[in-house]
């Protein structure tokens, strides 16, 4: 019956029957040796997988760049490439993303990085700083260990490819343009058109090829990864004929690579299309492959061994695969420092831009305020905008933005993504006393209390009777609105079903279809609805928004202790707040009692750190200097305060908290761990196990 159906189908369209099944991963190969191994891979996978797939087929191209283009054109689906090529694949127009990573080390302690090293023969008499004019062996142009890392160290910033080509007297750099840069291919051993080829058709291509170039006395130094010498020389006596060049201009044995390497770089990764990339199918295929044909699994076919050559399809040093988190693109996979180093290596001299700060704004309201600031900043500030806090954190981590102010909950995520606190928000004193200038800037930051606020009229409601009530939260992931109250509830219940504790909630940033968004109002200003959006488009977002939610719909609001005072007794002229009285509200204490809102010091859920400005380490000092200058102009009592107010917003808490008195020094709290403190870090750990973050998964993938 199935055959008859196919015959009928073919009568209408022969192409349909010849097309690959949807459950097929088309693997791209770059040489006849890889094509041969791919054929064995396909044949052996066919034996173990069900007829419906996943299947693997093989596509032949002449180089990794050709494979990247084939994947973009939907002529192939996957290829394993070095981190330097992950950079290339992630750029427009390709926009590919890493979906699976090789891991090394051991299965108990998988490492998704390796060491880039410079190997020389023992007895040669030069150090790393004396390599100019020597003969060099490289794995391939654009490869991490073979090109990007060593040339980034040896050349001044922004030197460009032409300067790199002139640094050595002669080289073998497979994949280089031998017509444009003949010296880069002078030492290569391929014949005819295969000389300097970007595949195993060039004898000195890849890790083992570059080492062979050194072994055969063609070059003076080989730039490879730390396992290359071990793979090619299993006998220690043979390895002892080689040494590593260290960055401190000493030499060490090849076994001592952990103390003598050029850089740690991310492992090779499988890349696929960002849209319709078959990530699930690729992972299913490779997971089955490693289970059946991984290290010491089968004598018939070895996935991580190459009888036809070295490092075919996957590197021979690979022990297995790890799935790359979905939020991780090429920039997050490689990390900002490595990504920026490649950009510097490729940049043409004289094209550097003047130093500025790119501020990340969340939502349109923040962007509007940021643009107003930018116009008056004297050209030192530009603006970028994203929809969520986490999107902004990712943008800063990737170098697409430079700074923003964050709540402690998001500061934790930012820290895990490699960002550092720069300055802290110091809040206005409740006694009305102002601290001007350096007095405020150098005053230790105190933070605030997280409180549970209820209406005084709900006299029977206590902390112990909150189950089944309606709750209002400033946003998911924030200290006062989420981390602390939900951590309390988790400690009480021991359950991660925190969305079932309350009957209805407004927790901006949650699934709009869930009960955690049931109370949310969407846009109050007549703009298109943004129900439960984690920004100011949601009317119940933020501290005042959560209090408004309590007034109009809820039973309890989780906010910071000044929130009620800031929105009552005429301090907030908006219609919902103008008639509110401070005595209309009370605080729920964890011991089951209630107290007036003025007694937060003895009735709170936790004391948490102030919001803080974060940036990357390389930009932190510049951001700090810029902000000190800007708050002298536009801070409270600033010289240009009438033109623009940093700490005042058209809605609430845009860019900075509205009750910020100044941005203050951190004293000694210069890491996110020191800034947040051990108790707060534990509270985050409790809640994070119930509500995982895709960005946090991506930022901790390499073990941060």
From Swiss-Prot:
GO biological process: antibacterial humoral response; iron ion transport
Record PTM: N-glycosylated.
Compartments, record wording: Secreted
Domain Transferrin-like: 25-347, 357-689
Glycan-modified residues: 491
Disulfide bond sites: 28-67, 38-58, 137-213, 172-188, 175-196, 185-198, 246-260, 360-392, 370-383, 417-699, 440-662, 472-549, 496-690, 506-520, 517-532, 589-603
CDD domains: PBP2_transferrin_C, PBP2_transferrin_N
PROSITE patterns to which the protein is assigned, alphabetical: TRANSFERRIN_LIKE_1, TRANSFERRIN_LIKE_2, TRANSFERRIN_LIKE_3, TRANSFERRIN_LIKE_4
Pfam family, one: Transferrin
Tissues showing expression: Blood plasma (at protein level).
Gene3D superfamilies hit by this protein: Periplasmic binding protein-like II (3.40.190.10)
Keyword list, A-Z: Disulfide bond, Glycoprotein, Repeat, Secreted, Signal
Signal peptide location: 1-19
Gene Ontology cellular component terms for the protein in this record: early endosome; extracellular space; plasma membrane; recycling endosome
Record note on quaternary structure: Monomer. Interacts (via transferrin-like domain 2) with CA2.
Record PANTHER family: INHIBITOR OF CARBONIC ANHYDRASE, TRANSFERRIN
Recorded family membership: Belongs to the transferrin family.
Role noted for this protein: Inhibitor for carbonic anhydrase 2 (CA2). Does not bind iron ions.
Protein name: Inhibitor of carbonic anhydrase
Organism of provenance: Sus scrofa
Lineage of the species this protein comes from: Eukaryota, Metazoa, Chordata, Craniata, Vertebrata
